[in-house]
């Protein structure tokens, strides 16, 4: 007899420890997606979504690499299920990108003169005091800040 495939996902050991936090962040994400954006610029409507996505990825990254509280199996499960952005986490592992806010800020095709975003400039080199990234609303994610 052929095996019957079920749609039920087997969660790895330790999932019950991180599930409440991920559920809270998912609820915040749904709320941010459904939030009306009256009076905001087109790009400002996406800023809360980018922040929550960054927060979820940073939570899983910190649990695995910094605090070492979750197993590799659980970490890879979270990446495969889309609970964290694996490309952003891959950049966080590289020197100079430890505090990167989003991947759009380092893509040169989205910026004038093929450079990176203004939030990647260290604070002591900026001419203006308060500046926000157009893509995600970040105020500064350079490693030297």
Curated annotation (Swiss-Prot):
It is found in: Nucleus. Keywords: Nucleus. Disulfide bonds: none annotated. InterPro entries: BUD31, BUD31/G10-rel_CS. Its main location: nucleus. Pfam families: BUD31 (PF01125). The keyword Cytoplasm does not apply. GO terms for biological process: mRNA splicing, via spliceosome. GO terms for cellular component: spliceosomal complex. The keyword Nucleus applies. Belongs to the BUD31 (G10) family. This is Protein BUD31 homolog 2. The lineage of its organism: Eukaryota, Viridiplantae, Streptophyta, Embryophyta, Tracheophyta.
């Amino acid at each position: 007899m052929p095996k019957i495939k079920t749609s039920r996902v087997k969660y790895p050991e330790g999932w019950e420890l991180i599930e409440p936090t991920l559920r809270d962040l998912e609820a915040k994400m749904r709320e941010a997606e459904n939030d009306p954006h009256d009076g905001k610029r087109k790009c400002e409507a996406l800023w809360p979504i980018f922040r929550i996505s960054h927060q979820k990825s940073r939570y899983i990254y910190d649990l695995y690499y910094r605090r070492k509280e979750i197993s590799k199996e659980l970490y890879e499960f979270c990446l495969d299920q889309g609970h964290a952005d694996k490309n952003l986490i891959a950049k966080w592992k590289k020197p100079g990108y430890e505090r990167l806010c989003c991947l759009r800020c380092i893509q040169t095709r989205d910026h004038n003169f093929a450079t990176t975003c203004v939030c990647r400039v260290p604070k002591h080199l900026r001419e203006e005091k308060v500046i926000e990234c157009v893509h995600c609303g970040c105020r500064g994610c350079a490693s030297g800040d």
